Amino acid sequence: MAKLQITLTRSVIGRPETQRKTVEALGLKKTNSSVVVEDNPAIRGQINKVKHLVTVEEK
């Protein structure tokens, strides 16, 4: 299965609590932090919810 590298490119300051929790659930803490996760529909849904805050690359 493919892997995705997700990078938090914008801050969560001033964002709704749901978006903050989603970013935290993806494993991102600080701006410019990155995680590599398995590509699946659940992760894709989380990325879609905060797509304006993150960048995604396929690995």
UniProtKB/Swiss-Prot annotation:
One CC-aspect GO term: cytosolic large ribosomal subunit
Keywords linked to the UniProt accession: Ribonucleoprotein, Ribosomal protein
NCBIfam families reported for this sequence: rpmD_bact
Family statement: Belongs to the universal ribosomal protein uL30 family.
GO molecular function: structural constituent of ribosome
CDD domains: Ribosomal_L30
InterPro entries assigned to the protein according to its UniProt record, in alphabetical order: Ribo_uL30_ferredoxin-like_sf (IPR036919), Ribosomal_uL30_bac-type (IPR005996), Ribosomal_uL30_ferredoxin-like (IPR016082)
Record's keyword annotation contains Ribosomal protein: yes
Annotated GO biological process: translation
Pfam family of the protein (one): Ribosomal_L30
Assembly with partners or alone: Part of the 50S ribosomal subunit.
PANTHER family membership: LARGE RIBOSOMAL SUBUNIT PROTEIN UL30M, MITOCHONDRIAL RIBOSOMAL PROTEIN L30
Species in which this protein is naturally found: Staphylococcus aureus (strain NCTC 8325 / PS 47)
Record protein name field: Large ribosomal subunit protein uL30
